[in-house]
Amino acid sequence: MRIYIEEDYEKMSKKAALIVASQIILNPQSVLGLATGSTPVGMYQALVEMYEKDDIDFSEVTTINLDEYYGLSKDNPQSYYSYMMENLFNYINVAKERIHIPNGMARNVVQECLGYEEQIRIAGGIDLQVLGIGANGHIGFNEPSNKLNIRTHLVDLSLETIEDNSRFFENKAEVPRQALSIGIATIMKANQIILLASGASKAEAIREMTSGHLNTQVPASVLQTHPNVSLIIDKDAARLIE
């Protein structure tokens, strides 16, 4: 695992954007696994700026999003579909048919999950997976659990995750209690992974995931076994690393 400690959030975001841009330049038909939440917003802004300067071209890129709230339609402003449109897709030339986000309104959850895995397979697998990390060490919506070798699935969100995500909603009661998420097994099949973290609230999770020990209660710790992982964090998130 490579660890890059940047001065602040802006530099962390630009470092991550450069890695994503390099992947696209090296392989214009790259399959990108994308994350949501507050952490990657700066990276997406930097990628849009690169696109506007004609430094990168998304026309042949395929995107695979990590997750979506279950029970939210894509036109709900808090859906991750809306998030991706507002933060990236509306501003670049990615083809709509190459955008893949789980359907939060799927009636048949099992079929949706199996179908999503099939979309990833047809795309050729994920070349570069972008991840954030929750305060409890979750990646995607893979919460602390005794089961890490799982693929796309419906997950019950932990109380801690619901509390963390309530800042995006009017009140905690509006936060969905379930989500569709790519599983750890699928994430680990990506050719390359970058994980971003910013702020002191993530410092404990970063320490736990880099401790050298695998811990099912810290899902991100499994990334230590992947051959090509880059951890890109700011100084606040790195403050507990020995």
Curated annotation (Swiss-Prot):
Known EC number: 3.5.99.6
Molecular-function GO terms, alphabetical: glucosamine-6-phosphate deaminase activity; identical protein binding
Domain of life: Bacteria
Active-site residues from the entry: 67 (proton acceptor), 136 (for ring-opening step), 138 (proton acceptor), 143 (for ring-opening step)
A Gene Ontology biological process term: N-acetylglucosamine catabolic process
Broad enzyme group: hydrolase
Alphabetic keyword roster: Carbohydrate metabolism, Hydrolase
Gene3D superfamilies: 3.40.50.1360
Catalyzed reactions per annotation: alpha-D-glucosamine 6-phosphate + H2O = beta-D-fructose 6-phosphate + NH4(+)
Pathway: Amino-sugar metabolism; N-acetylneuraminate degradation; D-fructose 6-phosphate from N-acetylneuraminate: step 5/5
Signal peptide from the UniProt entry: none
GO CC, any one term: cytoplasm
Alphabetical list of InterPro entries matching this protein: Glc/Gal-6P_isomerase, Glucosamine6P_isomerase, Glucosamine6P_isomerase_CS, NagB/RpiA_transferase-like
Family: Belongs to the glucosamine/galactosamine-6-phosphate isomerase family. NagB subfamily.
Function as written in the Swiss-Prot or TrEMBL entry: Catalyzes the reversible isomerization-deamination of glucosamine 6-phosphate (GlcN6P) to form fructose 6-phosphate (Fru6P) and ammonium ion.
UniProt protein name: Glucosamine-6-phosphate deaminase
Organism of this sequence: Alkaliphilus metalliredigens (strain QYMF)
Lineage of producing organism: Bacteria, Bacillati, Bacillota, Clostridia, Peptostreptococcales
